[in-house]
Regions:
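Alpha-helical transmembrane segments of integral membrane proteins
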Residues: 2-6, 97-130, 176-340
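N-terminal signal-anchor/first transmembrane alpha helix
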Residues: 1-60, 90, 94, 121, ...
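Residue-level recognition of pore/gate-forming positions within transmembrane alpha-helices
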Residues: 14, 22, 44, 112, ...
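Residue-level signal for discrete positions within transmembrane alpha-helices
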Residues: 96, 100, 136-143, 152, ...
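A hydrophobic, multi-pass inner-membrane permease signature
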Residues: 141-149, 193, 200
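Hydrophobic alpha-helical transmembrane segments of membrane transport/permease proteins
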Residues: 17-68, 157-196
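An internal, D/E-rich "acidic patch" concept
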Residues: 3, 60-116
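Alpha-helical membrane-inserting segments
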Residues: 24, 28, 118, 122, ...
Length: 340
């Protein structure tokens, strides 16, 4: 089985998943009480105006026609019009999605930078105090609600210590950098604006640490498990018998092989971070997709909520596709195994 045949299979799978998400979101949107045409027109609109809007949206057509039109629009990049703002949902997502991605990427980077070394040390010093501490941290991270942890760090670092800002992406008196990528850190660097860069970095620390804490423990446990498996292999004992230094064996022999089975977990963590950002952004008043969709839910903005579900699901499946291809590139035996 070649790389391109596997890529073709994964892409078909991606299309099927997105189609399935469209089916689910369409069904849910029609089960929820409420009239989108009435919500869009307003409470004081006449029945004639509401009926005109219903005809424009195609809500007076049979359900199968509405569904076919909805799926066709989704695959053309048209997610409908937001009831709350009157703007296309895709335009709204282009505004808020970069903020969520910046938070998710920074959180994943923190989880990897801290979690991988902890996992290595936990495996090397198995059943010692650091190993027990890492396992306790993993259990604590998984079981601690993100909103509770976020409120805790705000009270500590913003309320008592006054070390870091408690919300937002920038101080109110600063103008955002010129939009290039939508990531304030990168855009500020491209603009050469150090003041905006460091201010954006300060605002990013608390929410990214909060979001990274759960996945930090997961990454550490995954690396620990894979490292313990590799350290018990025959080639490690052979390397030790050859007189190679212990940490050289750990970092140059065991770690690369331990990272291979960890790629899936590390990649899918990014997809989880997109979902986890909803509560975190709400707590920290972070102007991303999470805070936007919470406001849309409160306003019964069905097109916005459905668009959020489709885009995040697509991003999650796309990350899964990249992980599968990366896994195949790192270990080509997977493709040969599938062919056999």
């Amino acid at each position: 089985m070649t790389f391109w045949s596997i890529l073709r299979q994964r892409c078909w799978g991606l299309v099927l998943v997105v189609a399935g998400v469209c089916v689910i979101t369409f069904i849910i949107s029609h089960l929820i009480p409420g009239d989108p045409a009435r919500l869009l027109a307003g409470d004081r609109a006449s029945e004639e105006i509401v009926e005109n809007i219903r005809q424009q949206l195609g809500l007076n057509q049979p359900l199968y026609v509405q569904f076919a039109r909805y799926v066709s629009d989704v695959f053309q990049g048209d997610l409908g019009i937001s009831i709350r703002t009157g703007r296309p949902v895709m335009e709204e997502l282009r505004v808020f999605f970069p903020a969520t991605l910046e938070l998710a990427f920074c959180s994943l980077l923190l989880a990897l930078v801290i979690g991988i070394p902890l996992g290595i040390l936990s495996a090397v010093w198995r059943n010692r105090w650091l190993d027990h501490l890492v396992r306790l941290m993993a259990i604590t991270g998984i079981s601690t609600p993100a909103f509770w942890l976020g409120l805790g760090v705000i009270v500590l670092f913003y309320g008592h210590l006054q070390m870091l800002p408690g919300g937002g992406r920038l101080d109110d008196w600063l103008d955002p950098p010129t939009h290039v990528t939508g990531f304030y850190l990168i855009d500020a660097l491209l603009e050469g604006n150090g003041e905006v860069f460091f201010n954006a970095l300060q605002h990013l620390i608390l929410p990214s640490l909060t979001l990274a804490f759960v996945h930090l423990g997961i990454v550490a446990r995954q690396i620990r498990s894979a490292m313990l498996e590799q350290l018990s292999e025959d080639y490690i004992r052979t390397a030790k018998a050859s007189g190679l230094p212990g940490w050289y064996i750990v970092l140059c022999y065991a770690l690369p092989n331990a990272l291979i089975p960890s790629i899936t977990v590390l990649g899918l963590a990014l997809g989880d971070l997109l979902y986890g950002a909803v509560l975190t952004e709400t707590v920290f008043a972070w102007p991303g997709m999470g805070a936007w969709v919470v406001t849309s839910i409160q306003a019964l903005d069905f097109p916005a909520v459905m668009g959020f579900a489709v885009v995040v699901s697509f991003a999650y499946v796309l990350v899964n596709l990249v992980v599968d291809l990366l896994y195949l590139w790192v270990d080509p035996r997977i493709g040969r195994g599938g062919a056999e």
